[in-house]
Amino acid sequence: MSAATEANGHHVGQSLRRKEDPRLITGRARYVDDIELPGMLWAAIVRSPEAHAKIVSIDTSAAAEREGVHAVYVGADMADLGGPLPCAWSPEGFNNPEHWPLARDTVKHVGDPVAVVIGDDRYAVVDAAEDVVVEYESLPVVTDPEQAIEGGPLVHEQFGTNKVFEWSLPGGDIEAGFAEADVIVERKFVNHRTAGAPIEPRGVLADYRAGALTVYSSTQVPHFLRLFLALLLGISEERVRVVAPEVGGGFGSKLQVYGEEILLAWCSRKLGQPVKWIETRTENMAVSHHGRDQISQIKIGAKQDGKITAYHVKILGDFGAYNMLLTPVIPVLGAFVMGGCYAIPAVQTDIVGVFTNKNPTDAIRGAGRPEATHMIEITLDQLAAELGIDRLELRRKNFIPRDSFPHATATAVTYDSGDYEKTLDKLLEHLDLEAFEREREELRAKGVYRGIGFSTYTEICGLAPSRITGPKGLGLAAGGWESAMVRVHNTGAVTVYTGTSPHGQGLETAFAQIVADKLGVDPANVEVIHGDTGTGPEGRNTYGSRSLAVGGEAIARSANKIAEKSKQVVAHHLEAAPEDIEVRDGKFSVKGSPDKGMTLAEVAGAVYIYDIPDGMEPGLEETTFYDPENFVFPFGAHACVVDVDAETGKVTVARYVAVDDCGNAINPLLISGQVHGGVVHGIGQALYERIHYDEDGQLVTGTFVDYALPTAAELPSFELDRTTTPSPVNSLGSKGVGEAGTIAASAAVTNAVIDALRPLGVTYMNMPLSPMRVWEAITQAKEGAPA
């Protein structure tokens, strides 16, 4: 048994170290860039320097004559492709332009691909790509979404508008709610554009031979990718295999069917050789999809005692130049939790998506929920100041009561479980607010302004119940189920095949813990296979904090089936009733007689030599396809303490405390790791990170010199705690946690900065809270300008 195992044999709930780490820290892990195949060629992609232009001509002759160059292709060469790149949702009135792996007539943003060069050597094809001469006829550019929607230059002329779609989620009587309000607060939020910036950029290696295609890709969605490779290339799906080897982070930016994946597969089939492309960091920042980029107008009404009566949000989403796999879905996810943790009787979200001449947006960690949480949490602080009510008391007054779960919200979803008072109470146990006020005064005398900000959040994850999101519900062209196959070998070793595709979360460890408890084995003897469509059943991949709540439940159900069959075998051998057999201390034993039992290895031995009850099929292998009945809704309360230098505007995060509730914990160590990473991501957006284009559509922040990511040097040690409110949706009682920190953090940081600067007259700010922006806010406040 593992050292962390309790006496009763339970591994779930223990902080086991990650099974994945030895191969990663010893350099034995294999990423796409580590894979080489005989006869492998390299690809370099020629990209547009123009944000919007007509392609007049492309001269590839000089590049094609380069030594070692095998081929140069342009969009016209791919006329045999079965269709454009996919978007999974097409609501009524949806404008969806064709989006091809290589642009055909016009380019719509800087970085749009126009040609690909294939050759023997990685660096030679990059040089050859510079010999491709493209003549462009520049067209008008629009990068401001408000200008785009108000009559700016058209990105796609065929639609006669830059509007992608309109979508509303009304709940309750919004007009009556505002009529009832004593106080109304209105604000404009700008949730700026960010990048996923994984440590490993994307990479693709395509190998077509003998009528079969294998694609190695740094992707979160190998099963989706296989489907669209088959459809677009006209290859029977069983002849297509997608492998996601080690994936060095994704954060949503690899939740995509990218043009490069289709392009390289097409090139490999055309040339009859493997073709590889590894994204540069510059390409990653320019053409891997971005996130956020919403401008929102909010209006909230409340009674004088603080009870909120109505909340209305109007979102203008900058989708960039094209709709990608889930582009229009992102603000919709936020709409489902727009009311946050609060019992607001009327909530309405109106969404307008708009095209601009920028890289497309799609899911980045949190995907709509950080934007929603940021708005409601900043707004509550603004409302509290307007009412003269303590901001925490305002939250408590409006929390959904703990005894009202499951709770049907005004935003068309039912929260599964929650206890928001409990997480806030535990958070305050970590904070000595009286001491904080003393420290605040001492620091202010030195010219340092200290503030504390709070963020109480809930999120929607465990995507997704197919009845809600699928064709019969929201209309997504995919079910939200997940699959798992559990196989017990002759020796009692266990292999798990999961349809979800981990990429850094530690799920090999968590899944092994679940199976270990179900079958009475050591997690070390449980191997988890993932990210390969050639093994195991069809799956739905990794996104939306779904891997544990949906994928883990599928695994648990398969393991339960094996456990039940094993109990019948043990009962047969021990002459006991199956219902009297339990899994305890590493074996299947008779209740009350722990000395009478069989290990899983002994059970497997009996099954495979066919010493089993009459009528039982041999084998210990079970498959489950699990479709949840509901989403799961993790929640928590975070606090951030910042120090602001009033002379320079520099913000320093002095302390960060987080209390999260993700239901029953499978591995607390993994939870802490996920919260750590998520909080850093949220702090990064609040203070440092920003994707910025100039008015000509040129990317200004295309490197890590310009796009500032936080490092350990900018951050304190985080203080983490948890409460436990099990979910009734799955048998594990668990919820997701991978995005929680990001969802809470930006609001906590922003509220802290505003709290610090309130004595100087600053009452409101939009992110990122850079030194220049903070200094300008202080200066304007001193001059009496409105915040």
Regions found by a protein language model. Name each.
Residues 19-23, 130-139, 222, 227, ...:
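Extended active-site and interfacial segments that coordinate phosphate-rich ligands
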Residues 14, 20-23, 90-92, 162-204, ...:
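Glycine-rich loop/linker segments at domain edges
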Residues 105-106, 236-244, 267-280, 284-285:
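Conserved catalytic cysteine-centered active-site region
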Residues 152-233, 401-493, 700-714, 719-721:
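Helix-loop-helix junctions that connect adjacent transmembrane helices in secondary transporters/permeases
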Residues 1-164, 184-187, 270, 759:
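Flexible, low-hydrophobicity surface segments
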Residues 246, 250-272, 276-278, 507-515:
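Thiamine diphosphate
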Residues 66, 75-76, 234-239, 269-275, ...:
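C-terminal catalytic domains of large/alpha subunits in multi-subunit enzymes
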Residues 82-87, 128-131, 226-228, 251-257, ...:
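Short acidic, glycine/serine/threonine-rich loops at helix termini
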